[in-house]
C-alpha cells in the first residue's frame, strides 16, 4: 500500500503536524519506505520460531527478598516537633 500526497496531508492534519508543501514529497517517500519495510518484515516466515523477550539468554541473579532492617519510625518521630497518628505535622503553606 503506497501513500499518496492526500494521505500524508490527512495524517499530518490529524497529528497536528505543520508540513510545508516542500516537505510533503519527502515525507511521503519516507512513510512509503517505512511501510515497504513493514511489508518485507511481515513476509518473513516465522512459523515455529519462539518470540524472544531479549536476544541474549542472560539471567540476573537476584537476592532473596528479606527484611534486613528494623522499623525506626518511633525513634525518628520522637524528635519531630509535631506528630499525630504516625504522621508528621507541618505548618500549612498554601491557602
UniProtKB/Swiss-Prot annotation:
Q: Which family does it belong to?
A: Belongs to the GatC family.
Question: EC annotation?
Answer: 6.3.5.-
The entry describes its oligomerization and partners as: Heterotrimer of A, B and C subunits.
What does it do? Allows the formation of correctly charged Asn-tRNA(Asn) or Gln-tRNA(Gln) through the transamidation of misacylated Asp-tRNA(Asn) or Glu-tRNA(Gln) in organisms which lack either or both of asparaginyl-tRNA or glutaminyl-tRNA synthetases. The reaction takes place in the presence of glutamine and ATP through an activated phospho-Asp-tRNA(Asn) or phospho-Glu-tRNA(Gln).
Q: What class of enzyme is it?
A: ligase
Recorded GO terms, molecular function? Answer: asparaginyl-tRNA synthase (glutamine-hydrolyzing) activity; ATP binding; glutaminyl-tRNA synthase (glutamine-hydrolyzing) activity
The gene designation is: gatC
Known InterPro entries for this protein?
Asp/Glu-ADT_sf_sub_c, GatC
Q: According to its UniProt record, which reaction does this protein catalyse?
A: L-glutamyl-tRNA(Gln) + L-glutamine + ATP + H2O = L-glutaminyl-tRNA(Gln) + L-glutamate + ADP + phosphate + H(+); L-aspartyl-tRNA(Asn) + L-glutamine + ATP + H2O = L-asparaginyl-tRNA(Asn) + L-glutamate + ADP + phosphate + 2 H(+)
Q: Which Pfam families match?
A: GatC
- Source domain of life is Bacteria
Does Protein biosynthesis count among this protein's keywords? yes
Please indicate if the UniProt record lists Lyase as a keyword: no
User: Which UniProt key words apply to this protein?
Assistant: ATP-binding, Ligase, Nucleotide-binding, Protein biosynthesis
Q: What is this protein called?
A: Aspartyl/glutamyl-tRNA(Asn/Gln) amidotransferase subunit C
Q: Which GO terms describe its biological process?
A: glutaminyl-tRNAGln biosynthesis via transamidation; regulation of translational fidelity; translation
Amino acid at each position: 500500500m503506497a501513500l499518496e500526497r492526500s494521505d500524508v496531508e490527512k495524517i499530518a492534519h490529524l497529528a497536528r503536524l505543520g508540513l510545508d508543501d516542500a516537505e510533503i514529497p519527502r515525507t511521503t517517500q519516507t512513510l512509503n519506505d517505512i511501510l515497504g519495510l513493514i511489508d518485507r518484515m511481515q513476509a518473513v516466515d516465522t512459523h515455529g520460531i519462539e518470540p524472544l523477550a531479549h536476544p541474549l539468554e542472560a539471567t540476573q541473579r537476584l537476592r532473596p527478598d528479606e527484611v534486613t532492617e528494623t522499623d525506626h519510625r518511633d525513634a525518628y518521630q520522637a524528635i519531630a516537633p509535631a506528630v499525630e497518628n504516625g504522621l508528621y505535622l507541618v505548618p500549612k503553606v498554601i491557602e
